[in-house]
Amino acid sequence: MAQLLMVTVTLGCISLLYLLPGTLSGSLGKGLRHSRPREPPAKIPSSNLQPGHPSLQPVVWKSRRHAPQPQGRGNRALAMVHLPQGGGSRHPGPQRPTGSRRPHAQLLRVGCVLGTCQVQNLSHRLWQLVRPAGRRDSAPVDPSSPHSYG
């Protein structure tokens, strides 16, 4: 059972590698293709660059449609895939309405500044201050001591 799971995961990873641009060329026996190093993103855009200038667009976020195609030999299975240039879909059939859907696996950050430990420490401190007066620790809570915060 474990071997079947391992084979399934391995084949899934290999097929995902073939879908990524520039990771494998040809078959598995030909080896890996060396990729070019990425350009660092522009830190501060200068005033003489136009908004559509290519140096303002990070390389990581470019769509595969607009990325330059490598010259020479490539994966023939990937070369057969036609990427439409006019914004159409490469999947035939009925079109689904595309809305602003968020991916399920990615969490959105909503601006919480406090970390988990800070929230736990503040909760513990609040509990220390408002807990019932019947049961107290042997030592009183010292607000200036870092040990009284958690």
UniProtKB/Swiss-Prot annotation:
GO terms assigned for molecular function: hormone activity; protein-containing complex binding
The keyword Transferase is assigned to this record: no
GO CC annotation terms, alphabetical: extracellular space
Marked site: Required for CALCRL receptor interaction: 109, 116, 121
Signal peptide span: 1-25
Tissue-specific expression: High expression detected in the submaxillary gland, kidney, stomach, and mesentery, followed by the pituitary, lung, pancreas, intestines, spleen, thymus and ovary. Expressed mainly in the intermediate lobe of the pituitary, with sporadic in the anterior lobe.
UniProt-listed InterPro entries: Adrenomedullin-reg_peptide
Location of this chain's protein in the cell: Secreted
Coiled coil feature spans: none
The entry's keywords: Amidation, Cleavage on pair of basic residues, Disulfide bond, Hormone, Secreted, Signal
GO biological process, one term: positive regulation of gene expression
Annotated disulfide bonds: 112-117
Main location: secreted
Region annotation Disordered: where it falls in the sequence: 28-102
Nucleotide-binding found in the keyword field: no
Propeptide: 26-100
Residues recorded with modification Tyrosine amide: 149
Domain of life the protein comes from: Eukaryota
Sequence similarity: Belongs to the adrenomedullin family.
Biological role: Intermedin/ADM2 is a peptide hormone that plays a role as physiological regulator of gastrointestinal and cardiovascular bioactivities mediated by the CALCRL-RAMPs receptor complexes. Activates the cAMP-dependent pathway through interaction with CALCRL-RAMP3 receptor complex.
Protein name in UniProt: Protein ADM2
Species of provenance: Mus musculus
Gene: Adm2
